[in-house]
């Protein structure tokens, strides 16, 4: 999934100058750094895809007006894959100052530039886009799904955690064998971040794989069911879970809290009956009350989807989904 996300982000067109600057600042910060060559400051970034290297060169030229060079390092030895080295030599110091890699006194900035750290939500999203393009990875959805960015240091990692917080996404900074990483493990949080940074097609593919894994897990449990009624109930639970998950994605936080709470209960206890869900609610509810709230949540989401011209919750229940159940 990492290559898929990076390919999509590399093709994303961004119009706002502040966002383009924030993305480039993060891409250079997480992808490389500053070097002194012959008494001059050289800005360098080492990247793992040619598309990202081309994007960096184009943006440096269009936004900042500086030329750059690219060198290709073939795979071999300790390098498992081709690497692309983008360098700005003649105008390195000017680029470093323009992107905030150097402060006003000419000292290296260890985290992210102040204009990115204190910027708007779009700047935070752009910084995450640049950081992911530089050193991000996304694992296949499953029990241990994660989105990670390798950081050049703890200051940059904490700045990225703060940027995620401004986007409403919880990320954590961790030191793994001496390497600073920013990690997001919650599936819904990963989906929210992919949306924020503009990886919409990748999100759909990731969510589809995530749903298939959940369906397979349910199918494995169904293999031990002898009672046909239990099978029908399980299929209904899969369908209900898929529709509620779609409703939560469509509505976000824009729905009455008691309806969202019922939806969360359904997702957190996928195999529970309505009566069991009612007992788990706080305060407890009857099964009819739980069913009514979930129905209203789905209706609200379908109405919103129709208004926006996007697939409604019914579209999430495909024949393949039920057949695999």
Swiss-Prot record:
It holds the Pfam family HTH_WhiA. It comes from the Bacteria. GO terms for biological process: cell division; regulation of sporulation. GO terms for molecular function: DNA binding. The keyword DNA-binding applies. Keywords: Cell cycle, Cell division, DNA-binding. Residues 273-306 bind DNA. Belongs to the WhiA family. Involved in cell division and chromosome segregation. PANTHER family: CELL DIVISION PROTEIN WHIA-RELATED (PTHR37307:SF1). NCBIfam families: DNA_bind_WhiA (TIGR00647). This is Probable cell division protein WhiA. It comes from Frankia alni (strain DSM 45986 / CECT 9034 / ACN14a).
